[in-house]
């Protein structure tokens, strides 16, 4: 009886999070509504940023492309010193992508393990382990966000299998959709992997582990509120369901990571070879230029997702004029700055090179090869300035207390995207993504 009471008390302390959706939403689901209390979560005090208690198992000596876990198995980079050619650049990109995926997979395994342990025996200790594993997996995935081509891309894109959104759907993470799954207990069924992407993945794990309130984020017209279904669930029952949901998410993320790794591997879909061998008769890309165009589109994650949605919108600089802090990425764990720093590192890996200190072939080598040294130098300076701007900056605190202070960081990232979408794509004869058509920002 005593142990059950302690467990119940711990479970009641667990709660529900906030999300947003840019995809088609179910009727009466509120998209992208700012959180009412974005700083509260788990054992975190209001306003505190989550800091993991353990280092990432993939930590190494700090080299841009080095790995810790599985470093030998993930040693894909074989042509760091190759002279520039389009073919060599595509090979480097393929190897870099495989290396980053190879580093993510053991973190997905660790996340599955820690979430399973938490679901089996909820406690402050198992919660800490689950949170640490989530953070480390998320930070490696923030690197992979820039590699949004091939199997990661949406279905309908060349080689796209839609696997990116299956693992992390930001900014389409949807709190109300998660709460509908909680009420319906779809996480306990065999069709959970068919639930909306905004209710699964790393964004949903954050929701389960960090938010402590027992309210929901759906509109008054949603069935959970309109029919008073949500209020029929006790705080303890809601907490129990969240713990079970977290365990199911771990299995789902691990399965999707395995699919993605296989899609790129020689023993699976071998998309690495598909990318590296682009050209006439290619299975996906009929020319090297077409393949490089797809890769360059990945770089534009920094323009739309980072500059606009991770910096501009929660700061009230674009698309929002009031109560904008709730749009922040990972608003409950409050690690928005870490995410953006990882995104910037990812841009440099893809643009400059995937080796230690960004050695190896990248788009900057292509610029030098065609005599556009000034463009390469301008981008290098912009990257260094953005690194300095975000290095010690607390985005979550700024969004809530002083959103105007984000403007210099936003401007630093805008300088990168301005060079990218004007000089770089013009000189290299690349096409801008469709999302930029008509964009004058």
Regions found by a protein language model. Give the residues of each.
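Ser/Thr-rich, Pro/Gly/Ala-heavy low-complexity intrinsically disordered linkers and tails
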Residues: 20-72
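Sec-dependent bacterial lipoprotein signal peptides
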Residues: 1-18
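Mature extracytoplasmic or organellar-lumen-exposed domains after removal of signal/transit peptides
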Residues: 69-441
């Amino acid at each position: 009886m005593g142990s059950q009471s302690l467990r119940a008390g711990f479970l009641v302390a667990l709660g529900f999070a906030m999300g947003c959706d840019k995809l088609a939403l179910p009727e009466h689901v509120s998209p992208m509504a700012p959180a009412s209390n974005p700083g509260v979560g788990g054992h975190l005090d209001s306003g505190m940023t989550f800091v993991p208690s353990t280092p990432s198992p993939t930590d190494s000596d700090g080299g841009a492309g080095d790995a810790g876990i599985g470093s030998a198995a993930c040693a894909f980079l074989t042509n760091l010193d190759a002279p520039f050619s389009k073919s060599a650049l595509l090979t480097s990109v393929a190897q870099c992508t495989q290396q980053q995926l190879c580093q993510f997979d053991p973190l997905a395994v660790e996340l599955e393990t820690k979430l399973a342990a938490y679901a089996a025996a909820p406690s402050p200790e198992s919660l800490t382990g689950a949170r640490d594993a989530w953070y480390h997996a998320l930070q490696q995935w923030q690197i992979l966000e820039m590699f949004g081509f091939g199997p990661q891309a949406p279905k309908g894109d060349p080689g796209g299998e839609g696997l990116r959104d299956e693992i992390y759907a930001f900014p389409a993470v949807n709190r109300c959709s998660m709460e509908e799954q909680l009420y319906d207990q779809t996480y306990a069924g065999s069709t959970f992997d068919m639930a909306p992407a905004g209710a699964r993945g790393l964004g949903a794990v954050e929701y389960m582990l960090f938010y402590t309130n027992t309210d929901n984020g759906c509109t008054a017209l949603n069935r959970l509120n309109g029919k008073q279904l949500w209020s029929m669930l006790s705080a303890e029952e809601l907490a129990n369901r969240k713990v079970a949901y977290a365990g199911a998410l771990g299995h789902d993320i691990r399965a999707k990571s395995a699919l993605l790794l296989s899609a790129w591997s020689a023993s699976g879909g071998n998309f690495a070879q598909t990318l590296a061998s682009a050209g006439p008769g290619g299975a996906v890309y009929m020319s090297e230029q077409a393949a490089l165009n797809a890769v360059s589109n990945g770089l534009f994650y920094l323009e739309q997702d980072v500059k606009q949605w991770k910096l501009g919108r929660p700061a009230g600089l674009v698309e929002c004029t009031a109560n904008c802090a709730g749009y922040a990425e990972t608003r409950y764990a409050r690690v928005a700055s870490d995410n953006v720093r990882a995104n910037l590192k990812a841009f440099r890996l893809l643009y400059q090179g995937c080796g230690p200190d960004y050695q190896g072939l990248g788009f900057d080598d292509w610029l030098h090869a065609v005599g556009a040294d000034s463009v390469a130098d301008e981008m290098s300076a912009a990257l260094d300035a953005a690194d300095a701007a975000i290095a010690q900056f607390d985005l979550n605190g700024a969004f809530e207390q002083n959103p105007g202070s984000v403007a210099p960081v936003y401007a630093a990232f805008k300088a990168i995207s301005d060079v990218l979408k004007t000089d770089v794509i013009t000189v290299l004869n690349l096409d801008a993504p469709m999302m930029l058509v008509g964009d004058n920002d």
